[in-house]
Structures are given as C-alpha cells and as structure tokens.
C-alpha cells in the first residue's frame, strides 16, 4: 500500500473546512479544482512517506495520465468504496455525484444512491403530509357528525355545513334567500339541515330521518330554492307531497316565507276543479313549486287530458314518507306510484323525509333510487329528548275521564293536544269537556275544510286551550309552544307514539307527554315503554317484563285497533232520543223545501 491508497482510505467520508485550512485546501486542490497537465505533480505531493513509485508503475503501467485526470474529475476521485464489510450503516460514496459545498464553506460528499434515497424520503414526507392532512380533515368531519349525532350512509358523502354562511362561501346562495333565512330566526342550522342541505345541493337522492320539530321542512326547502335558481315559465320544477292538507298548508307557508323577494311562484291545490283550469295544458306554465296531498294530485293526473303536467319536475320531495308508504286505507302507496311515474324528467331526483324510519321505505329507496344517501339524526325511531314522558295507569275507560278531569282541576299550562283513537271518541270527549269551563275544540276528518282551518288558526292564536284530535294532526303539524300532549287512547304502535308526542318539545323547547293506559293496552305497552326508556324517562319495572308482540300481531293491532267503551257519560236512552229528534228535524226541513218548490 502506497501513500496514495492510504490517503484515500483515511479521507473517506471526511469533511474539509475550507476556510480554516485554506492553505492545505489550496495545496491539495480540494473543492472546485482545475486539473491540468501537472496532475502528476499533485500525486507526487501526496507522497508523504517518500515512496518514489509512480502511479503508472503502481497500477501495472496500464493507467495513463489522461485516465488519471478523468478519474480525478469525477466526484471523490480520491475516494473509493471500502471492500471491508461494515456492521454499521454508513453513507456510501460513488464516483458519479459531485461534491456539495455547504454555506459555512465545508465540503460534504454525497453519493448518488444517498441522493436518491434523500429524494425518495422527501417525496414520501410530502405524500405523508397530504395524506395526514386528508386524514385529519376526515377526523374533524367525523367528530363534528358524532357531536351532533349525525349518522350517514352512502358513498362519496358531501361534507356537512356548520353555519348558513357556508352556503354563500361554498354554494353561492342568493343573498336575498340567505337574508330571508336569517330574518326568519334561523341563525344556526339544525343537525338534519347540516347534512341534508349539502346532500341535496350535490344532486344526490336522499332518505332522511330526524326527530319531530328538528327543521326538516327547511332542510329540503333551502336546496330546492337554491337549485331552481330563478323563476322560469317551464311549469312545476319541484313537487312536495304530504299526507294531510294541514301539513301541506304549513309547508306552503314556510316556502313562501323564506322565498320572499326571489320571485318564485309557489302553489297549493285547494280545489281540484279550479286547479285543472289553472295548471292544465292550456295554462301559461308560470309556476315553479307545487305543495299538495296525493289524492288531489291523482285526481288531476287521471283527467283526460291530464289536468297537470309533471314532466319538468326536477325535485320530488315526500314528507312523512313512512305514512305515505303505508298499505290500506290510511296509506298512499298506490297514489305515490302514479305520481312517481308522472315525473318523467331525466333530471328528477327524489328525497324522502320522516321522523321515523320504516323498513319498507328504506328497502324501496335502496332498490329504486340512484346512489342514495341515508341520513338519520340520533337513534332511529326514538322520541325527542326534550319531552318529559309519563305513563299513567287509569284502570279502565271510566278512569281515563276521571284522570282527565283531575288534570283540569289541578291546572295545566295551555295549549294542550289530546289524541284519541277515532272520530266518534273525539266527539264524545269534546261533549264531556265542554262543560268543564275550558276553551276546548275538536278537529277530525268529518269536519269541513273551512272548519278545520278555523280551528287550527284559533289554536295557534291561543283562543283554544285544549284541542282534541285524531291521528290527523299527529304528522308534521307545527304548533308553536304546545306544552302538553295527552294520549287519551293508547297509540297502536311506537311509531304513532313518537309522532304524537312530537307535537310538543319542538325546536329545542321543553314539553311534556302523558299517556293513559288500561289493562286492555297491555299488549302494546312494551314497545312504547322501550321508546320512553331510550329517551331517559322512567318506566315501571313490571312493564319491562311484559312479553313482546310478534310482527304479525303488531300489524294486526295497527289495522284493527282495540274496541273501547264509550267515553260519553250520558245515558243511552237520552242519546237515542237526541238522535231521533235530529233525524226528525232534518226530515221536516226536507218536507218544507219540497213544499216550497211545488
């Protein structure tokens, strides 16, 4: 081994401080060196131990001066890979990467392999950083959803919104529409609005479930108005279906309120004959949104030619979808099928809203809707937590009336809603309570539309303290400030119970629900008790031990409710006499009219 080889081994991986050892650096030409014909002198200068052999002799006379110069011009010409095995990992140098000069003047040798590894590491860090950022973003969204009890199912889910101002930043909402929302008192979106609005704005079909009084109407009204953008003369471009006229009227009122100043023409079908002329084939088509019940719309569609055109509908919204999808007299499954077929536009999208999830509706949506997103707030089919719920055993049907009168004597905070099983029982209870000295009225399907509208208006205005009703008002109707709901007759299912008590405790306000039950209601108690317990309200221990009903038994109970004793305390003899007098009076009127005509 000569001095040249020794120097190469001693200098492997070393750093040279050019500033500190400038003389030596100049002498040994470290750094940016210009190699000339005197390269042999440089080699001689490295002969510290007086070894007189030339490089050519050492290399067997095969290496020329030009080859030596080429070797020195490569990176680390003075350095070679060590052939000895090393236990520790060290930086390896090759002869194809030039030396890098640090800012402090030192020279640091870097191999091409190491450079590639460093580049790969840097790229990996960048990649990891972007992945981490995306992961953090998703974690924040999941935390936000969990905080507000938002449960979402589907693919490629849109992010929820936290404020209505985000609609301006991300979706370019009309300034007037945004101002109307804020002026109406909606400062912060509710959980269902946080997720349902972005889903509909992305044009996705939706199945949404949220507790009663959680703002579902606004959740579909805002995206409809945003996506329609402005009024056009193409006919109806949005259709909202609800099970009752009272609920349809409420939705119509809310849509007009938040669309004020935007120019949208929002209509509701009051009388089918007038609607056929107004919306028929010869109409000007100067309308945008229609809110209606299924039966009135079906009547128009069956006309020849059809009394209404739905071929331009872009959004079909079904409110209280689980009720509308029911079979039998109380459901509208067949009517909905006809309405769906009438909406033939390729742009049509559908959204289903309800306070409860029905298995039939969910399965139908998965089979028939395209790339559907399912959104639910809180536990499925659960009662709203702002309602204090109580089960009250009254023994028999007679005990119900006694308990009702006891509540009146103790005093209550109106307004109060009282639910009964049938129209006949609603009339009977009304006649019993009218003599208790309280402002009471009744609403049911046998009353005229004008009477129903007047009753609802009086109840909203506070003129009526206690309103007796059937299941007609259990769906969707929003009465501001209802403090107490009394289930005079036990509901036929937990779903009906949830909708009934949902008339109180709305929009974050507190409310109370009292449910009377007798020995005859024992088969239905268990399912309702589970709902009450899930909401955090106490349930007697003995009720928890009751046997569960089979699904067939539940369906039978819903279709054929219990036969109950009459509420009326008036003896049957007097009731029959009153009926006879009524019939006699009607007959005498008919005779008088016939005489007048003759």
Curated annotation (Swiss-Prot):
- Segments forming domain Helicase C-terminal: 386-547
* Localization: Nucleus, Nucleolus
State a GO cellular component annotated for this protein.
nucleolus
Task: Give the location of motif Q motif in residue numbers.
Answer: 166-194
Reactions catalysed according to its record: ATP + H2O = ADP + phosphate + H(+)
Instruction: Please give the residue positions where the record annotates the modification N6-acetyllysine.
Output: 15
Span of domain Helicase ATP-binding: 197-375
Among the record's GO biological process terms, what is one?
rRNA processing
**According to the UniProt record, where is the region Disordered?**
59-98, 578-598
Principal location class: nucleus
Q: What is its EC number?
A: 3.6.4.13
Fetch the SUPFAM superfamilies from UniProt. P-loop containing nucleoside triphosphate hydrolases (SSF52540)
Protein name as annotated: Probable ATP-dependent RNA helicase DDX52
Could you tell me which species this protein originates from?
Answer: Rattus norvegicus
Q: Organism classification, top ranks? A: Eukaryota, Metazoa, Chordata, Craniata, Vertebrata
| Gene name as annotated | Ddx52
């Amino acid at each position: 081994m000569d001095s040249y080889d020794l120097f190469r081994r001693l200098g492997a991986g070393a750093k040279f401080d050019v500033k500190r050892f400038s003389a030596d650096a100049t002498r040994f030409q470290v750094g940016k060196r210009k190699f000339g014909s005197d390269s042999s002198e440089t080699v001689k200068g490295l002969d510290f131990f007086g070894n007189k052999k030339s490089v050519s002799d050492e290399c067997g006379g095969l290496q020329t001066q030009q080859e030596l110069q080429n070797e020195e011009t490569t990176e680390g010409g003075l350095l070679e890979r060590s052939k000895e095995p090393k236990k520790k990992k060290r930086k390896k140098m090759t002869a194809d990467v030039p030396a890098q000069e640090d800012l402090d003047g030192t020279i640091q040798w870097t191999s091409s392999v190491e450079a590639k590894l460093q580049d790969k590491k840097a790229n990996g860090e960048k990649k990891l950083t972007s992945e981490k950022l995306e992961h953090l973003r998703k974690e924040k969204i999941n935390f936000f959803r969990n905080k507000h009890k938002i449960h979402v199912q589907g693919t490629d889910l849109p992010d929820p919104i936290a404020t209505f101002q985000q609609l301006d930043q991300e979706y370019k909402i009309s300034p007037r529409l945004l101002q109307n929302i804020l002026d109406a008192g909606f400062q912060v979106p509710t959980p269902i609005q946080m997720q349902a609005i972005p889903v509909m704005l992305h044009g996705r079909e939706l199945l949404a479930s949220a507790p009663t009084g959680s703002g579902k109407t606004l959740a579909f009204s805002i995206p409809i108005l945003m996506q329609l953008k402005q009024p056009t003369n193409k006919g109806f471009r949005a259709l909202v279906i609800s099970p009752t006229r009272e609920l349809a009227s409420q939705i119509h009122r809310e849509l007009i309120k938040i669309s004020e100043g935007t120019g949208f023409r929002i209509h509701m079908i009051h009388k089918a004959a007038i609607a056929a002329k107004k919306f028929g084939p010869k109409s000007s088509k100067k309308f945008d949104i229609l809110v209606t019940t299924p039966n009135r719309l079906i009547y128009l569609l069956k006309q020849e030619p059809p009394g209404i055109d739905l071929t331009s509908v872009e959004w079909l919204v079904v409110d209280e979808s689980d009720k509308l999808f029911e079979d039998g007299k109380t459901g509208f499954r067949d009517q909905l099928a006809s309405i769906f077929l009438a909406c033939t536009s390729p742009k049509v999208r559908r959204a289903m809203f309800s306070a409860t999830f029905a298995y039939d509706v969910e399965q139908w949506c998965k089979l028939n809707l395209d790339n559907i997103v399912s959104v639910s707030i809180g536990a499925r089919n659960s009662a709203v937590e702002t309602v204090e719920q109580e089960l009250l055993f009254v023994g028999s049907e007679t005990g119900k009336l006694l308990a009702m009168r006891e509540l009146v004597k103790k005093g209550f905070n109106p307004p109060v809603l009282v639910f009964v099983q049938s129209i006949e029982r609603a009339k009977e209870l009304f006649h019993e309570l009218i003599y208790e000295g309280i402002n009471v009225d009744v609403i049911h399907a046998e009353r005229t539309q004008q009477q129903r509208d007047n009753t609802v208006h009086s109840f909203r205005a506070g003129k009526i303290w206690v309103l007796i009703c059937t299941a007609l008002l259990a769906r969707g109707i929003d009465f501001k400030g209802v403090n107490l709901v009394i289930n005079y007759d036990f509901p036929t299912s937990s779903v009906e119970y949830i909708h009934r008590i949902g008339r109180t405790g709305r929009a974050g306000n507190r409310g109370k629900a009292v449910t009377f039950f007798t020995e005859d209601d024992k088969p239905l108690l268990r399912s309702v008790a589970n709902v009450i317990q899930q909401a955090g309200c106490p349930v007697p221990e003995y009720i928890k031990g009751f046997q569960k009903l089979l699904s067939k038994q539940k369906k039978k109970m819903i279709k054929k409710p219990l036969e109950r004793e009459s509420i009326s305390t008036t003896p049957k003899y007097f009731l029959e006499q009153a009926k006879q007098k009524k019939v006699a009076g009607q007959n005498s009127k008919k005779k008088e009219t016939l005489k007048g005509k003759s």
